[in-house]
Design a protein with these regions (language model features):
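Accessible peptide chain termini
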Residues: 1, 241-242
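Basic/hydrophobic alpha-helical interface regions
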Residues: 1-141, 150-164, 174, 178, ...
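Pan-zinc metallopeptidase signature
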Residues: 131-241
Length: 242
C-alpha cells in the first residue's frame, strides 16, 4: 500500500484519536492538545496529552496516521498505567531512566489490554529506530545517556539499534542492560522506580570512571605542560649564562 495514500482529513484523524485517548486512558475527560511545536508528553496527574499537530494539509498519509496513533496510544497508556505520587517523581538522570523503563513496561501492559496497540507500538519502535540512527549518523545527537537508554529500549523489544553506539553509550549498555531487561517483570511504576535507582547507580559508576579518566589525563597534560615550561626556562637560563 502506498505511503502517499490519504485516509482522513487532518482534523478528522485528530478527533478520532482524542476519543481513543479517553478510552485507553480509562477517563472520558482525557484532553488531547495539538500544538505547532515538537514536544510529545502527557500530564498523568491532569489527564492532558500534548502532541504536535500533523502538517498534512492534503490529508493524513499512512505514515503520519501511524505516527499520530503511536503518540496518542503511548501517552494515553501513561495516563492509564503510570501511577506514581507526584512527590516521588524524580528529576534529572534518574527521571530519564525511569521514563525509558516505564515506557517499556507500560506499552507491554497496554498491548495486552487493547487489541491493536501492539502492532502500533512495534511500528513506532521500528520507525524511531531508523530516525534516531539518522540523527546520530548525521551527528545531530551527542547524549550518551539518552543514546544508551533508547538503545536498551529497542533491545528489550527484540530490536538491534540501527546505528553503532558511541563509546560511552556502549559502556552504559554493557553495565546496565542485564538490569534493564528486568523491566518486564515489574508490576507497577513503583517497582520500575526501584529498578531505575539500581540502574542509576550502575551508570553513575561508569560516568564517574569517565570523569576520573578525564581528570587523570588533564593532570598528566598539566604536569607535562609544566615540565615543558620549566625545560624551556632552564634552556633559556643556560643560554643567558653563556
Amino acid at each position: 500500500m502506498s505511503e502517499a495514500v490519504t485516509y482522513y482529513k487532518e482534523h478528522e484523524a485528530e478527533d478520532a484519536m482524542s476519543v481513543l485517548a479517553g478510552w485507553m486512558g480509562q477517563n472520558s475527560k482525557v484532553k488531547v492538545i495539538y500544538h505547532s511545536g515538537t514536544a510529545v508528553d502527557a500530564d498523568i496527574y491532569k489527564g492532558i496529552i500534548r502532541i504536535p499537530r500533523m502538517a498534512c494539509a492534503s490529508g493524513i498519509t499512512q505514515e503520519a496516521l501511524m505516527l499520530l496513533r503511536g503518540r496518542v496510544y503511548h501517552e494515553a497508556g501513561h495516563i492509564d498505567e503510570t501511577k506514581l505520587p507526584k512527590a516521588e517523581f524524580p528529576q534529572g538522570a534518574l527521571k530519564e531512566i525511569l521514563n525509558a523503563l516505564e515506557d517499556r513496561r507500560m506499552e507491554s501492559v497496554e498491548s495486552k489490554k487493547h487489541k491493536g496497540c501492539e502492532i502500533v507500538f512495534r511500528w513506532s519502535n521500528n520507525y524511531f529506530n531508523r530516525k534516531i540512527a539518522e540523527q546520530i549518523t548525521q551527528k545531530k545527537a551527542d547524549a550518551p545517556l539518552w543514546e544508551a537508554l533508547v538503545a536498551m529500549s529497542f533491545m528489550v523489544e527484540g530490536l538491534q539499534p540501527a546505528w553503532r553506539l558511541g563509546g560511552k553509550a556502549q559502556d552504559y549498555v554493557d553495565a546496565a542492560y542485564s538490569e534493564f531487561i528486568k523491566v518486564k517483570q515489574c508490576a507497577n511504576t513503583l517497582e520500575v522506580l526501584a529498578l531505575a535507582k539500581v540502574i542509576y547507580k550502575l551508570l553513575k559508576e561508569v560516568n564517574d570512571d569517565y570523569k576520573q579518566d578525564k581528570q587523570d589525563k588533564q593532570d598528566k597534560q598539566d604536569k607535562q605542560d609544566k615540565q615543558d615550561k620549566q625545560d624551556k626556562q632552564d634552556k633559556q637560563d643556560k643560554q643567558d649564562k653563556q
